[in-house]
Amino acid sequence: MKPTLLLLAAGMGSRYGGLKQLDGLGPNGETIMDYSIFDAIKAGFGKIVFVIRKDFEDDFRNKILSKYEGHVPVELCFQSLDALPEGFQCPADRVKPWGTNHAVLMAKDVIKEPFCVINCDDFYNRDAFQVIGKFLADLPEGSRNSYAMVGFRVGNTLSDNGTVARGICSNDDKGNLTTVVERTEIMRVDGPVCYKDEQGEWVAVEDNTPVSMNMWGFTPDYFEHSEAYFKEFLSDPKNMENLKAEFFIPLMVNKLINENTATVKVLDTTSKWFGVTYSADRQSVVDKIQSLIDEGVYPNKLF
């Protein structure tokens, strides 16, 4: 069975003005998302599912979905504040979405096969899709609790225009993930890659340290775990009182690992990540895409 690609496209970029999901960066106005979908099709994915906001649907259908017709089946799911389990109500003052794992849950009725989750505004590059696509395609039929994460080498994921936030990963001797620790300020400091610790000190890490770029491989049983844990999350009064509390994928993954419920294989990739974290990054992404086209990695026009 071909795996499915799940794109999380309901969030808006906080650091970069404008609807960055729709920003044309390729020569014919292609978005980063278009390149991800092209790479996924090449890597053997058979269906694309988007999670978006309902009020974004018309724009999305007209500007995005129409171009994929005839290339790959697509489905839309919607993330909203009131999409909560029975018995729970969204606090009246909350405006922030419930987080990446809540977005994943929105696709539970349309995904019945192994799937890969990605952000829509990160350029992951071809090798990353091939690595995760192979892992998912090779899973035995009916596989459960055997997941994966593409571990990008931190030195391949930096911005020239400021710090980036990344989940720094540790794994055991079998290559399985043991922890993901979110570090919100990572950059090169006088040569080495460093993150700022809780005391405000710079701590150096090796360039090839794996980090999470939110590229995960799951089987459909992940939805069951997520539904159960989301109820626990909502039952905790502090998560309801804190209007910015979010149900993130690493929160769920860490719980499953700590309870020995699931294993998450860290898959190495040579891919260099790029994205528009800051407005000043935009031109460098345009230039990098053009150089990949010049090298023959992508055609001039994707779809």
Feature names for model-found ranges:
Residues 126-215:
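Conserved core of the sugar-phosphate nucleotidyltransferase
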Residues 227-262:
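A C-terminal functional module that forms or caps the active site or interfaces directly
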Residues 22, 169-171, 266:
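A structural signal for short hydrophobic beta-strand segments in well-ordered beta-sheet cores
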Residues 1-7, 27-117, 124-125, 129, ...:
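Conserved N-terminal catalytic core of the sugar/cofactor nucleotidyltransferase
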Residues 1-19, 23:
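N-terminal nucleotide-binding beta1-loop-alpha1 segment
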Residues 12, 121-122, 154:
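Active-site metal-binding loops of divalent metal-dependent hydrolases
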Residues 215-227:
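Conserved nucleotide-sugar donor-binding
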